[in-house]
Amino acid sequence: MAARDPEATKARIFEAAVAEFARHGIAGARIDRIAAEARANKQLIYAYYGNKGELFASVLEKKMLDLAISVPVDPDDIEGWIDRLLDYHAAHPELLRLLFWEGMEYGTAELPHEAERQEHYARKVAAVRDGQERGVITDAIPAPDLLFLLVAMANWAVVVPQMKRILVGGGDAGTDGLRDSIKKAARRIVDR
């Protein structure tokens, strides 16, 4: 019999949960499918994470932390930051799908672990505010609003790929053109 490796099992559960939640949302996800994909016992998932909602929250928290580490907000190089953000989401579209599902499921209701999420975004807003205070980017738009606008521009094409395809085309030319337009728009929004 092979030795059990709890960390490897947790990693398989995590990856299976990311795929399941990105595909089906919180309500539509099934622990049975996650367990089968992860080659793990269903009871083990509950032991590790408590319930499906906690598993979703754990998955989303870890994916958001990965983004924050991989693509920190950079007010000194907005176009470069937008480029890196677009690249990240092209390589990891599941994060935006998870956030979209979360929005559909919770709407304006308070999220589980909302205080931690607010801290996460407060750090990003602080980076934007720092750029404003140093005169690198405009302070005509409040820092939280500015961050929201920039992130929305960069993320929307991944959230609704059908609209991107319909409006700008599905090939590389459409994608490259949209990327350039997003960067130009971002630069104009932040210019002093």
Swiss-Prot record:
Protein induction: Autoregulated.
Entry-linked PROSITE patterns: HTH_TETR_2
Activity regulation field: Binding of a wide range of cationic hydrophobic compounds to SCO4008 causes a decrease in DNA-binding, probably via allosteric conformational change of SCO4008.
Residue ranges for the DNA-binding region feature of this UniProt entry: 30-49
Molecular functions per Gene Ontology: DNA binding
UniProt domain HTH tetR-type: residue ranges: 7-67
SUPFAM superfamilies, per database record: Homeodomain-like, Tetracyclin repressor-like, C-terminal domain
Domain of life of the organism encoding this protein: Bacteria
Keyword annotations from UniProtKB, A to Z: DNA-binding, Repressor, Transcription, Transcription regulation
InterPro entries reported for this sequence: Homeodomain-like_sf, HTH-type_TetR-like_transc_reg, HTH_TetR, Sco4008_C, Tet_transcr_reg_TetR-rel_C_sf
Domain characteristics, as noted in the entry: Contains an N-terminal DNA-binding domain and a C-terminal dimerization domain.
Assembly with partners or alone: Homodimer. Four dimers bind to the two operator sites.
Function: Probably regulates the expression of its own gene and the adjacent SCO4007 gene by binding to two operator sites in the SCO4007-SCO4008 intergenic region.
PANTHER family: HTH-TYPE TRANSCRIPTIONAL REPRESSOR SCO4008, TRANSCRIPTIONAL REPRESSOR
Protein name, entry field: HTH-type transcriptional repressor SCO4008
